[in-house]
Amino acid sequence: MTPCKEPPGGARNLLILTLSEFALIERLRRRLVGPPDQIWVGDDVAVVPAPVGAMLLASDAVVAGVHADLRLVGLDDMGWKAMVANVSDIAAVGGRPCCAVVTVAGPLGKIDFDLLYDGLTAASSAYDCPIVGGDLTSSDTLVVSVAIVGDGGGGDLPAPVLRSGARAGDAIFVTGPLGSSAAGLHLLQTGRVSEAPDLVLAHRRPRARLDEGTAARLAGATAMIDVSDGLAADLRHIADASGIGVVLERVPVAIGVNRVSNDPESMALGGGEDYELLFTAPDPDLVESTFAARGLGKPLRIGRCTGDAGERRLRDGELPALGWEHT
């Protein structure tokens, strides 16, 4: 795979360069197909059916040069990532996405917005989360901001799972091995894409774990977060919010990461953007049986929660301060 260049050029891009802001909005609006019971893009407000029970709201932004290097990935990858990062936040409380609004700020004469929306709409379709509106404005830096409304459910479902409910004695689980995205980014940065296309794809097109989030919620998860900042950082987030200690007994490293890094465990601990779900639960047998009953892979048990609120251990040593920090 050849690293993508931006802007891509071609006849489509030449057309976009000539469009006014309102004409571009209309062009993008025609790409969005919504359910018939919604008032669609064109009004300043989208009217959507309200969830029964808890309503979930998530918002996150992807900034070119900060969260996406457009010398290495395409605008469609940036759009995909912006949507999936928010869907993953909904998954991390055990909810389901309902709809999204997308705000894009960027240099209107230099960006192929159709390509950007290829990624946004592909992700919204993959996760059944229609784009119902948004905004478009001019900016020197490309920023894609997505806000999602989600359904937290009600009735017999347990409450949505926050990161603050872990208790001493809970086991710590993660839904899959880690480090794939960081390894893929490293391959892109070093021009070694052909060595492990699956790792590159894990970075370019991450996946949200919606079904796993629901299963963890049904299995009595007490705290949950998606692994976006890195296992070490996100485990600290749970421990800090819950006021408990944590002992990480094993670090599950994804297949192939050891071929990319001399320190694959550190890549798994600090790489981030894997979007696996990290959760705590008191009953490991219930976790295993609930995931199995829903046809999902067995979560990996990686540690335990303790009553010492200051404890942050990796095996017999200190949990390293790895991962992404938002400043």
Task: Report the location of each language-model feature.
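Glycine-/charge-enriched secondary-structure boundary and capping motifs
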Residues: 10-33, 73, 107-132, 137-144, ...
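A short, N-terminal amphipathic alpha-helix
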Residues: 82-93, 124-126
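A short, well-structured juxtamembrane/interface segment
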Residues: 205-215
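Glycine-rich anion-binding loops of enzyme active sites
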Residues: 49-52, 62, 96-186, 304
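Glycine-rich anion/phosphate-binding loops
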Residues: 37-39, 70-85, 109-118
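Short, compositionally biased
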Residues: 182-199
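Extreme N-terminal cap/leader segments of soluble proteins
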Residues: 3-6, 10-74, 93, 102, ...
